[in-house]
Amino acid sequence: MVEANHILQRSGENFKKFIFSFTDQNGRELCLRPDLTIASCLRYLKLNIKGKEKIFYNGEAYRKSQNRADSIIRSQIGFEIIGSKNEKKDDKVIIDTALKSLQNLSYTSGTLKIGNVQIFNLLIEKLDIPKRWKLRLVRHFWREDYFNDLLKRLETNSDVDPTIVEVDKKRYKNMLKDDKKKIIAGRSIEEILNRFNKKIKDPRRTNEGKKISQIIRKFLKISCPIDQAAIQLNSFFKKNDINIFVEQNYFSISKNRIMKLDVEFSASFGRQLEYYTGMVFKIDIKNKLQKKNILNGGRYDKLISNLGGKKETPAVGAAFNL
């Protein structure tokens, strides 16, 4: 049992419909744990552990599913590395551990899909859009439908409220009469007027918003064998004059096929849980009867601090769904 806000805080409000929650006699909203990663982080905090810890666990998680045939009780086996600063090495250790664990399973084929939320965040940071838009796009990356609505608004420049513009114009005219060196809320009137001129009198052109939106949409469509990931990403960034370069060894895996798994990169993959901050991956396997998602994992460097830790703590892990 955990407090529901621990889950919703970093998994997103949309995730709420999948958890089993109730309110106790003190008004606290509690829920059955929907996964064991957050439970492991809460334990790390409770024990006041300093530095690196490797965790192995097995237990049950409780989550509703869109498929009524799925069980609400999910048995999981997981492994985490918390508090280590060797990010690339740890990412590889987690993926390698996951692959080794497949050796005793019977399956005919499968897919190891890899994404990286950090690359998306870097892209947004480099785009020539107002800071408020950067914050919105990063914050709502996990809410796919709402994120697409934001891209449509970006295309039409519809975030400018005409009512607010009229009020600002009145303030603008009054400020023109004031001393330009006068300070208001930490900025000089001259700075405020310059910003107003840039934002309102010469707003971002609609075609600029369309261009930015198209760049984001095209980026999210990048999907390829893992050995082509750096090549395709760098080609995309160069074509769109974006100052980002991905090294060939950036990804923990470079082979397109490992065991019976095709290894793929997807720029849009990683939108399931809001607490992911870097590398994310999943393994789906097939046998004669069905295709099944057997494992999910990724890096979550901000989860410890968001759950009450005093600082960000590097962490990465994965869990099997049995």
Task: Mark where each language-model region is.
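Short, glycine/charge-rich beta-strand/loop segments that flank catalytic centers
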Residues: M1-N5, K54-K64, T111-L122, H140
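Positively charged, Gly/Ser-enriched RNA/tRNA-binding surfaces
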Residues: V2-A4, D35-I49, I55-Y107, D159-L322
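Glycine-rich loop at the start of a catalytic domain that most often binds anionic cofactors/ligands
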Residues: H6-S21
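Acidic surface patches and DE-rich sequence motifs
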Residues: D24
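Hydrophobic alpha-helical transmembrane segments in multi-pass integral membrane proteins
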Residues: E29-R33
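Short coil/turn segments at secondary-structure boundaries
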Residues: E53-Y57, L135-R136, K152-L154, A267
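Short terminal or interdomain "cap/linker" segment that borders an active site or interface and mediates
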Residues: N116-V117, N121-E166
